[in-house]
Amino acid sequence: MLILYHIFIVNLIFKILLMKNLLVPVGTSKNTVSHLQYAVDFAEAFGAKLYVVHIYKVFTKAGTMINLDHILERESKEYLHDLMSKIDTKNVEVVTKALKGKVVDVLELVSRVANIDLILIQPRTNSVNDEVFLGETSGKIIKQMNGPASLIVPEGFTFKPTQHILMAMKSAIIRKEHVLDPLKSLKAKFKCKIDLLLVKTPYHNEGDFDVNDELKSVVDDISTTENATTFQGVLRHYESHNPDMLCVVRRKRGFFMKKWEKNVILKKDFSSSIPVLVLSELK
């Protein structure tokens, strides 16, 4: 009886840890179908509900009283319907929404209302410039949005269970609750190894490398390095760790903020052939 109770508790904790609601904003890039299939496969692995959102702006034709709102809404819904017809949704519950407004505002609202655990982002939602890693829209989501963690999925990437995550940060101080939940969920589901790389930069402060018990319970190995930026630390240690997912932290002046002020991020500045998990601000 005691063993059955223990199994019940373990299974209950496992279910609590798993991500339940995922959000995918879609654009018009040629990678959208591939990205959406990845999102469905990811959701299936977690038994999660998938929200697919296409956001459109409202315009009034100059010199007329014609409001294009209803036309754009209809076209957006038709676009979503066409997209979903090209996807194998498997057993995943998929909710599609055509919503008007500014991208960041809409996604923040949806995240709150639907209790989103993770946003899956393609590098270029609308951009066709091959020199760009993160396009204007995707970069804006990563840099400006206050909300859940994001997963940047490389173009054409096929879903597979995560085995090894390299987590890089220059400060391990955590003051907010639940920011590590996506990592805990990945670890609970895939039993993946998580290596923590603490990067000492010229802006290092006393206590930055104090790893609390919560973070210690998530990671399997901790190492330190000294580099000018967190990004350079990742480059230096990437091959020795050979991860199949990177994990960084979104901060006001963090990994994606300091080096590039514009929303667009060029491939010459940063690119990744594996998914990048961007956690919410820790402080």
Predicted feature locations:
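Intrinsically disordered or low-complexity boundary/linker segments at protein termini
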Residues: 1-34, 123, 140-179, 270-283
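Small/aliphatic-rich secondary-structure junction motif
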Residues: 17-65, 164-224, 243-245, 271, ...
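Generic structural signal for helix capping and beta-alpha/helix-loop junctions
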Residues: 59-60, 104, 128, 159-160, ...
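Short glycine-enriched, charge-decorated loop/helix-capping segments at active-site entrances
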Residues: 65-72
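A short helix-to-beta-strand connector/capping loop
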Residues: 89-95, 216-221
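Charged docking surfaces used in two-component/phosphorelay signaling
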Residues: 98-106, 227-230
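Gly/Ser-rich helix-loop-strand patches that form or flank binding pockets
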Residues: 108-158, 240-241, 245-283
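A short, acidic, amphipathic alpha-helical segment used as a generic capping/interface helix at domain edges
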Residues: 228-239
